[in-house]
Every structure is written in structure tokens, then in C-alpha cells.
Swiss-Prot record:
Keywords: Cell cycle, Cell division, Cell membrane, Membrane, Transmembrane, Transmembrane helix. It is a single-pass type II membrane protein. Residues 96-370 are extracellular. GO terms for cellular component: cell division site; plasma membrane. Residues 304-314, 327-342 have a biased composition (Low complexity). It holds the Pfam family FtsQ_DivIB_C. Residues 25-34, 47-63 have a biased composition (Basic residues). It comes from Pediococcus pentosaceus (strain ATCC 25745 / CCUG 21536 / LMG 10740 / 183-1w). This is Cell division protein DivIB. Residues 356-370 have a biased composition (Polar residues).
């Protein structure tokens, strides 16, 4: 019957039947070799599988717990740091260190520091954070309100210090061209708009017909101290045959100063001391060296004084010669008088000797007669 059944099976069914039989035989051999209990391998497999599941579950839960703990820690750190940053920000914002405290101005000479600070529109105790973003605005305000400033830079540090650097092109005075007053800047540029009545705050520059001469003069003039510049009322360019770049200063205190273009800036800083030492108003010559003389002193007067001084010196020399001659004659007369006295005394002495000798002779003769 089996043969008949096998013959009736299809090839695929035969293969499956043989494969199942082989697998059963292998399983039986393995079960006999491992244990006597046929159910033990399955139980151990189940236990192992269960243990593996438990272990994997424990590891998974531990990992999940650890990840949750780390995420909570990270979240706490993030929230804490955010709160600290916010607290520091508000603490800094409302404290004095967030405010402008100090100012420093450099580069100004004619424009006062107080005027610059007023026009820059920055005040003490302004918030640094908002002021830093307005540096360009402050610079524009300063340039608009001060025409004497050519360039300006405003920098604000987080320490509360404001640094202002300016480059001046201030009005130095008025130059006369064709009997008309024009404002002249520090760089030598002349403002085209004329002025009918110049301000007394600035000096007047005369006879500067060439712009190159005017620029050269203003370059040196700007180096003088403000105190000396404020004392200048007028400057004339008055060259001579010998001195091609002579300058004639008229000062507000009544003095007049002669100087040379190349050296007047260095020498004029000593003018206050020279003026204070003068007993009366006069002339100060700074062309060669530095000396002063009274007013009304001209070259002719100087020559006359020099000739009078030479005449006085010659008369003094003549007087000295006369006195020496008189002293010599007096010495000779005294010597002759001494010699005559000695001669007279000698003659009188000889007469006395003769008389005494005559008396002795008469006495002797009388004795002989007796």
C-alpha cells in the first residue's frame, strides 16, 4: 500500500515527505544526545528567550531613563543659563556701567571742547547700547553745527567712554582783496561771500595777494598758541629789498611786531613774556633774535642815537686825554718845586757855613791881637 501511495505522489510531494522525515530524524538524534527529557530543550529555549527579552527590556528601560534624565538636565541647564543671561542683561541695563560716563576730545584748537560736546548731542548717563548705534548720527550733527570742523569721528566703548576726534578747518581771519573783506579758512581757502563789516573776533590780513603766500602764512599762523592769536589785530605782508618775507603784526595791546615768515610761529610764543617786560608800548623785532624798543623808534633815530653815542664816547676819550695831560703837568711842576726847594736849602746851608767860618776867623784874629 505504501508503494502504491508513493507511486501515486507527485515528485514535489515526495521531496517534501523525504525532507520532513530527515528533519524528524535529525531532531530525534539531537534530543537524545542533549537530554533524556524531550521537552527540556524547548523549555530551556523558552527560558533563554524569556531571559533575553527581560534583559533587553531592562536595558531598553535603563537607556530610556538615562536619555530622559539627560534631556531633563539639558533642559534645566538651558533654562537656567537663559534666566542668568536675562538677569545679567537687565542688571547691566539698569546699572551705572551701562551708561556713558567719560568724554575725551582731541584734535581741536580753535573750537572749544565745551562747544564740541554740546553739539555732538551725547550726554552723560545716556545708555551705551542705544548710543553705539547712533555714532554716525552724532558725527553728522557735529559737522552740521560746527562749520569750523572739517571731519569728525565718534567712537563709544562698552566701558562708557566716548572718544571724539576732530579735524579743524577753522576761520582764521579776514583777507582784503580789492578793498573787500573775505573770510579765510585754516587751509587757505577764501570764502567767496564778502563781508562788509568784519568781526572784531578775528584779525585782518593785508597785502596777501597770492594764495600760495597766504597758505604758507596760515600754516605757520595756526601753530601759534591761541592766547597769542587772540592778541593779534592785524597782519601786513610787508617785504623789503633785504627781507623778502617780512611780516608786520599789529597787536591788541598796542605793540607792533616785525617777524619773518619762516620763523615767526616759533618766536611769537615768547611774545607774552616780552610784552610783560616792556615798560611802555613799542616795537618788538623778531627778525634776527628778539629785542624791543620804544614806540616812534625809526632807523633814522637809531642812526642818530648811534652817532650821538659815538660822539659822546669820543668826547669822553678827549676828556680822559686832557685829564691825563693835566696830571702829567702837575707831576712835573711838583718835581721842579721840589728841586728848587732842595737848591735853596743847600744855598742857605752854605751861607750859614760861610758866616760861621768868618766868625771863627774874627775870633781868632782878636785872640792873636790880644
Amino acid at each position: 500500500m505504501k508503494k502504491k501511495k508513493d507511486e501515486e505522489l507527485t515528485p514535489w510531494a515526495k521531496y517534501q515527505k523525504e525532507h520532513n522525515a530527515n528533519s524528524r530524524s535529525r531532531f530525534k538524534r539531537k534530543r537524545k544526545a542533549t537530554s533524556k527529557n524531550p521537552r527540556e530543550p524547548q523549555a530551556s529555549f523558552r527560558r533563554n528567550n524569556r531571559n533575553k527579552v527581560k534583559k533587553s527590556n531592562k536595558k531598553g528601560t535603563k537607556r530610556i531613563v538615562k536619555e530622559q534624565r539627560l534631556s531633563r538636565q539639558k533642559l534645566g541647564i538651558l533654562i537656567g543659563s537663559t534666566l542668568i543671561v536675562i538677569a545679567l542683561f537687565f542688571g547691566y541695563f539698569y546699572s551705572s556701567i551701562s551708561r556713558v560716563q567719560k568724554f575725551s576730545v582731541s584734535g581741536n584748537k580753535r573750537v572749544s571742547t565745551a562747544k564740541i560736546l554740546k553739539n555732538v548731542s551725547i550726554k552723560k548717563n545716556d545708555v551705551i547700547l542705544t548710543s553705539i548705534f547712533k555714532e554716525g548720527k552724532f558725527e553728522n550733527n557735529l559737522l552740521k553745527k560746527n562749520t569750523d570742523i572739517k571731519d569728525a569721528t565718534v567712537s563709544i566703548s562698552w566701558s562708557g567712554k566716548v572718544k571724539i576726534k576732530v579735524k579743524e578747518n577753522a576761520v582764521m581771519g579776514y583777507v582784503i582783496r580789492n578793498k573787500t573783506y573775505y573770510t579765510v579758512k585754516q587751509d587757505g581757502s577764501v570764502v567767496r561771500k564778502s563781508v562788509s563789516q568784519p568781526s572784531s573776533d578775528y584779525p585782518i590780513f593785508r597785502n596777501f595777494q597770492e594764495n600760495s603766500t597766504l597758505k604758507k602764512f596760515l600754516k605757520e599762523y595756526a601753530q601759534m598758541p591761541n592766547s597769542v592769536q587772540n592778541d593779534v589785530a592785524e597782519v601786513d605782508f610787508s617785504p623789503t629789498k633785504n627781507v623778502k618775507d617780512r611780516l608786520h603784526f599789529f597787536m591788541n595791546d598796542g605793540n607792533q611786531v616785525y617777524a619773518i615768515m619762516s620763523t615767526f610761529a616759533k618766536k611769537m610764543k615768547y611774545y607774552p613774556e616780552i610784552s610783560a617786560s616792556m615798560k611802555e608800548r613799542g616795537m618788538v623785532d623778531l627778525q634776527v633774535g628778539a629785542f624791543s624798543r620804544p614806540s616812534g623808534w625809526t632807523d633814522e633815530a637809531k642812526a642818530a642815537s648811534e652817532s650821538s653815542k659815538s660822539a659822546e664816547s669820543s668826547s669822553k676819550a678827549k676828556k680822559q686825554e686832557k685829564t691825563t695831560q693835566n696830571s702829567e703837568s702837575a707831576d712835573s711842576t711838583s718835581a721842579s718845586a721840589d728841586s728848587t726847594e732842595t737848591i735853596n736849602s743847600a744855598s742857605s746851608q752854605s751861607k750859614e757855613d760861610l758866616e760861621s767860618s768868618n766868625a771863627e776867623s774874627t775870633v781868632n784874629t782878636q785872640q792873636d791881637i790880644d
